[in-house]
A protein has these predicted regions:
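Membrane-interface helix caps of multi-pass small-molecule transporters
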Residues: 14, 19, 36-47, 70, ...
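Alpha-helical transmembrane segments within multi-pass membrane transporters and channels
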Residues: 21-61, 276, 281
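Membrane-cytosol interface at the C-terminal ends of specific transmembrane alpha-helices
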Residues: 176-199, 250
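Pore- or pathway-lining transmembrane helices of multi-pass membrane proteins that form conduits
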Residues: 48-69, 80-81, 174, 245-260, ...
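Hydrophobic alpha-helical transmembrane segments
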Residues: 3, 7, 24-32, 54-57, ...
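Transmembrane alpha-helical segments in multi-pass inner-membrane proteins
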Residues: 28, 36-38, 220-233, 237-286
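Transmembrane helix-bundle core of multi-pass membrane transporters
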Residues: 63-186, 243
Length: 286
């Protein structure tokens, strides 16, 4: 993951700075390259049946070296690419403006936190009601209310702390988009259930008539796409591209997944759980 992040970021920096390419075209190329890298690795894993550890280890070493080649061992600054930097949350003023005034507390951020807490509470109650209606096992109302109170309090406290600073950072918008999109995909789509099924028991899934090779291929291609997005955010926040970016991202990603409830054997875990794991990893590394 880290090497692909570095490689895609290096390509983007060279295109925008050295070649003076249009920003939107450079972004498109970065997404395409990341997706193709994921597809390349997915092909060897899904169809040639080379162990994933071998393929990803080779990719980690290869793309780290290619990043060094692309950047020629130097740092490429993208400070002048202000639109790109601001779009991906790298500038000092990359925060959502306060639409309710310019006081010491960003009221827009507080309002957004209240809305998020209310939406979370409604979704939790609706989810429980749906389970009860369909006859599924559901947590009792007391535990549901307790969960809502605790998480809503965390959301409100977090939003208030942001409001005391500068408000909502624009990079947080990208994080929320990824959470919502992939939370929906994994929970409410057929493809998402296929991912869980293949992770839980590949043989049983294949005997059920599901093309497991295609599922593996799509999973790795998707990860290449996300690595490209991470590469853009990384170089935007650092306002430069360096051959050393992305080091140890692999361990951060693995640790975040396991802390967040995912299993090494597959088939379990949720997107919100992984986000919690990532937050804890970030706190540990401070």
């Amino acid at each position: 993951v880290g090497s692909v992040v570095c490689f895609v970021g290096a390509i983007g920096a060279v295109l925008m700075v050295n070649m003076k390419m249009n920003m939107w075209l450079a972004i498109l190329i970065m997404f395409v390259i990341g997706t193709l890298i994921g597809a390349f690795q997915g092909f060897w894993i899904a169809y040639v049946r080379i162990p994933p550890f071998i393929v990803t280890l080779a990719g980690m070493l290869a793309f780290r070296g290619l990043s060094n080649v692309v950047l020629q061992g130097m740092t490429v600054s993208i400070k002048d690419c202000t639109t790109f930097v601001n779009l991906f949350g790298g500038g000092a003023d990359c925060y959502i403006p306060d639409f309710f005034g310019n006081g010491p507390i960003n009221l827009t951020c507080v309002f957004a936190g209240v809305i998020a807490a209310v939406i979370f509470a409604v979704l939790q109650l609706k989810n429980r009601a749906d389970k009860v209606k369909k006859g599924y096992e559901a947590p009792n109302m007391g535990s549901t209310i307790g969960k809502i109170v605790v998480i809503a309090a965390v959301i409100l406290a977090f939003s208030y702390r942001l409001a005391q600073h500068k408000g909502i950072p624009s990079v947080l918008i990208w994080v929320l988009i990824v959470i919502m999109v992939y939370g929906y995909i994994t929970s409410n789509t057929t493809v998402g259930r296929y991912f869980y099924a293949v992770g839980g028991n590949e043989k049983a899934t294949k005997l059920s008539g599901i093309n497991t090779n295609k599922v593996y291929f799509l999973a790795y291609m998707n990860m290449g796409f996300l690595a490209a997005l991470a590469g853009m955010v990384t170089i935007a926040r650092m306002t430069s591209a360096q051959p050393t970016y992305g080091q140890n991202y692999e361990m951060d990603a693995i640790g975040s997944c396991f802390i967040g409830g995912a299993s090494a054997y597959g088939g379990t875990g949720t997107v919100p759980g992984v986000i919690v794991g990532a937050v804890l990893m970030g706190v540990i590394k401070i």
